[in-house]
Amino acid sequence: RVRAEMKVVLRGPMKGLILRKLQKATLKFPALIQELVLNIQSEQPQGFEASMSRVPDANRKQQLLQALQKLDPFHAQIEAVADYGSRASERFLQRLRPYEIADFYKLPRQNTLAFFLEGTQVGLFTLNWDILCPACRGAKKQSKSLRELERKVHCEACGINFEVIESKDVELSFRFAGEIAIEPAPIYCIGNPSRSPTIHVQMPLAPHEKRKLALHLPGKTYRLRDMKQGHLLRLVVDHRGLADLHVKDLERLRQQNEVAVQADVIMHWENTGDQWQVLRFDCLDPHHDAATADQVAALPSYRHLFSDDALRPGMQLGVGHLVFLFSDIRGSTQLYRELGDSKAFRLVQDHFALMESLIRKEDGAIVKTIGDAVMATFLDERAALTAAIAIQQYYEEHRQDNTLPGLKIALHSGPCIMVNLNDHMDYFGTTLNICSRLLDQATDEDIVVSGSLFDMPKVQDFLSQQDITWTQDEQVLRGFQGTRTFFRLKLRRTMPTRLIS
């Protein structure tokens, strides 16, 4: 079976003529041409928005509602996914995207992702890791696990080979399975500007033609790309950048590698060759509706249900941003000596259970424990701070009864790499090294926070609402040159907690 999908946008005096020609062609291809004519005449939205404006299939919705009852605690997600599955077009049903569905129905993203993950365990969904083309963002390769991901991939639509080196280029999606499965269908590239969110502007220019264009770039980073020659230039939006961008000698432009431009920039474009040129501005900013590999791997629900899934040995993915919490029991050697091995070991195990409970409550995940130290990840700085404060509150309360030792905590955020270590997902990089060294500076009466994390506006807003004080400190961290600024957060008072049973 072969299916072609096309969208035509006509403007100016030629629109009426072409419409009349198409209407005559309905004798040969009546259904196809009729739909094409309707699309040309229609001013209705296209893509996802148009798909969700359709009337739900009542029978399909009832079938989905009945099957999804196996996931009883997720009442809101059951209703939303049943509605989505009964009205979305075939193209969107081939890749169920949890964040896209959650945003449309105004549901919590992580709960919706947990719903799909739980559903795979009972056979309602199948899970796919999609490798996305950096140009058109289409899913070019799929695998059932992170371990099966291929590093080198080819996109036929864009005519490029690319390597998977960033976690943002790997997205988790799902398909209905079992009794509610749908027939598989090929996914075609739909890389025209009106339906591909990454394409900001795409423009043709005839041989020896000149054009002056006023562009508005609302994002942070873009790639200027020639459809024949590929990548030309990386553009960074900066108010101090160029107000005019001259595009004439493409090879010379490519050698500049990166240029800063203003958000409102004038492009002076001249095609000096004998062939048509097509230039495209691709937005390189992260896509916030994609459940990317770095986000999913940091969630407690994924680590709990798919604890054995990790990248293949030797493969690594760059992670743009994660928040790390490091903790360590103060004086653990003395603890074992005073309490004895058996009692001290039980205390440490109880400590891990406490940490797991409070970290998971804020959608964080424990990556690993080393001795009595804990390394945990969060997607959000405020969630990490909330967990750290709750942990310290608990220890402050129980240390007064001499039932728990002191605990040191440090927080830092930034980029890192995701790797396979001993068949489990792990992280490495300078961000983690700094967090580890900050833990050396912590005491059991404070929470050490890196200067970069502390200065974030959302962190400042969060801290202003907490009953804590802070002091600034500067030290040379072991293994790093120069002093680094960090902050010591201290609880003003201990609040009664009932955080774990």
Predicted regions and their residues:
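N-terminal accessory interaction module
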Residues: 182-287
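Intrinsically disordered, glycine/charged-rich C-terminal tails and inter-domain linkers
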Residues: 228, 444-445, 451-501
